[in-house]
Regions:
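Metallocofactor- and cofactor-centric catalytic cores in central/energy metabolism, strongly enriched
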Residues: 2-146, 150-164, 168-173
């Protein structure tokens, strides 16, 4: 997609924030045949199939610890349920993530707010006029983001004044 054929999205807040990002449910389909087929292809398709094969070996190895590392806003892009399912079904042993993934994205949606599909070509000045933030092609309602920040501040204000590790603070968030 380029700027010329990018979707024409409205000029008011409601028209910009009209298509929520949907999180993938990896339990709703069987991707094995697709991944196996990719092993006979080229470029990154074959690499993806090889990575899946290695991952399967890791899951089968009782002496292997699997760390999932996340950077950026992949949970806002629709991967949040994937991460939850990987933990739920013991497919990862640990997650190392940036604060954006845990605080600004997961906690934001835990409060009932949503991320919305948008366009990376949208004029940021127009978005700013409507109090909308953009992460590449994903939109966030700035009013809701500020509500999230206030909620975190209110929780922080109830804590005993001392230094907290990231884990301790995230635990306090719930």
């Amino acid at each position: 997609m380029n700027k010329k054929n990018s979707p024409k999205i409205g000029h008011n807040k409601k028209s910009f924030l009209n298509k929520p990002v949907e999180h993938i449910d990896i339990t709703s389909f069987d991707a094995r045949k697709l991944i196996e087929s990719m092993s006979k292809m080229s470029f990154t398709s074959r690499d993806t199939a090889k990575a899946a094969s290695i991952y399967n070996e890791m899951i089968s190895d009782k002496n292997c610890s699997i760390f999932l590392t996340l950077a950026g806003s992949t949970s806002a892009a629709g991967c949040m349920k994937i991460y939850a399912d990987l933990v739920k079904y013991n497919m990862v042993d640990a997650i190392v993530a940036t604060g954006a993934s845990i605080i600004d994205m997961d906690f934001f949606e835990a409060l009932g707010f949503k991320h919305y599909q948008g366009s990376q070509f949208q004029d940021d000045t127009e978005l700013r006029k409507n109090y909308i933030d953009r992460i590449y092609d994903t939109y966030i309602d700035e009013d809701q983001l500020q509500n999230c920040d206030r909620t975190i501040g209110e929780i922080a204000d109830t804590l005993e004044p001392k230094a907290y590790t990231s884990r301790e603070f995230i635990y306090e968030l719930g």
